[in-house]
From Swiss-Prot:
It comes from Paraburkholderia phymatum (strain DSM 17167 / CIP 108236 / LMG 21445 / STM815) (Burkholderia phymatum). One of its GO terms (molecular function) is RNA binding. Coiled coil: none annotated. Pfam families: NusB (PF01029). One of its GO terms (cellular component) is cytosol. Involved in transcription antitermination. Required for transcription of ribosomal RNA (rRNA) genes. Binds specifically to the boxA antiterminator sequence of the ribosomal RNA (rrn) operons. GO terms for biological process: DNA-templated transcription termination; transcription antitermination. The gene is nusB. Belongs to the NusB family. This is Transcription antitermination protein NusB. Keywords: RNA-binding, Transcription, Transcription antitermination, Transcription regulation. InterPro entries: NusB-like_sf (IPR035926), NusB_fam (IPR011605), NusB_RsmB_TIM44 (IPR006027). The keyword Transcription applies.
Length: 145
């Protein structure tokens, strides 16, 4: 059974995918997501934070991701881009969620919605990004190994 947080990440990824392709306003995407399958079992507060936060902060999040990518962000598939934006937002704004959980959730989203090996790319990018955004946490984890 999927957790409410996982459902919120799935819906946010779907909404951001739509936003990346259509450029629709956040309010319109939000309204459509409220009718989506699984919405009733999602963490609505987390979904709203991710969806609206990523759209609001997309330029800054893209700038954070850029040094970790092997190509310009606009050349990524919309699915990979949406997944990476969700994870970047969580790494930056939800310090209560361990970085390994953020990466694992993003990998699962990439497996669910992305291409065959997209999850490997997402994992590599987020390893680099977490080392930048969560320095103390990633260094402490490295010392434990």
């Amino acid at each position: 059974m999927k957790s409410a947080r996982r459902r919120s990440r799935e819906l946010a990824t779907q909404g951001l995918y739509q936003w990346l392709l259509s450029g629709s306003p956040a309010g319109e995407i939000d309204a459509q997501l409220r009718g989506a399958q699984g919405y009733d079992k999602a963490d609505h507060e987390h979904l709203d934070a991710i969806l609206h936060g990523v759209i609001r902060d997309s330029e800054a999040l893209s700038a954070d991701l850029a040094p970790c990518l092997d190509r310009p962000i606009d050349q990524l598939s919309p699915v990979e881009r949406a997944v990476l934006l969700v994870a970047a937002y969580e790494l930056k704004n939800h310090i209560d969620i361990p970085y390994r959980v953020v990466i694992n959730e993003a990998v699962e989203l990439a497996k669910t919605f992305g291409g065959a090996d997209g999850y490997k790319y997402v994992n590599g990018v987020l390893d680099k990004l977490s080392a930048k955004l969560r320095v103390d946490e990633t260094q402490a984890a490295a010392r434990k190994q």
